[in-house]
Structure formats: structure tokens, C-alpha cells
């Protein structure tokens, strides 16, 4: 899980979602998981 100020899609499988007010990126590739912080 990467914590970044600006999250963005890395590949076409990445999906932007909101969980508990935080923007997150989930993907089939675990390296692409990101959270805005």
C-alpha cells in the first residue's frame, strides 16, 4: 500500500474508490494499491 498526496491509475485494471472519505486505488496488481494521505 502506497500512501500518496496524489493517487492515480497506473494501469487499465486500476480502479478509483472512496472508503471512509479516503480516495484509494485498488488493482489486480498488489503493487498498484494506493491510498491518499
UniProtKB/Swiss-Prot annotation:
UniProt xrefs under SUPFAM superfamilies: Ribosomal protein L36
One Pfam family here: Ribosomal_L36
Judging by the UniProt lineage, the source's domain of life is Eukaryota
The question of whether Oxidoreductase is a record keyword is answered with no
Q: Which GO terms describe its biological process?
A: translation
What are the alphabetically sorted keywords of the record? Answer: Chloroplast, Plastid, Ribonucleoprotein, Ribosomal protein
A GO molecular function annotation here is: structural constituent of ribosome
What is the annotated localization of this protein?
A: Plastid, Chloroplast
Q: Which GO terms describe its cellular component?
A: chloroplast; ribonucleoprotein complex; ribosome
The text of the family note is: Belongs to the bacterial ribosomal protein bL36 family.
UniProt-recorded name of the protein: Large ribosomal subunit protein bL36c
Amino acid at each position: 500500500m502506497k500512501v500518496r498526496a496524489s493517487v492515480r491509475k497506473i494501469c487499465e485494471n486500476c480502479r478509483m474508490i472512496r472508503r471512509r472519505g479516503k480516495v484509494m486505488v485498488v488493482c489486480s496488481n498488489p503493487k498498484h494499491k494506493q491510498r491518499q494521505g
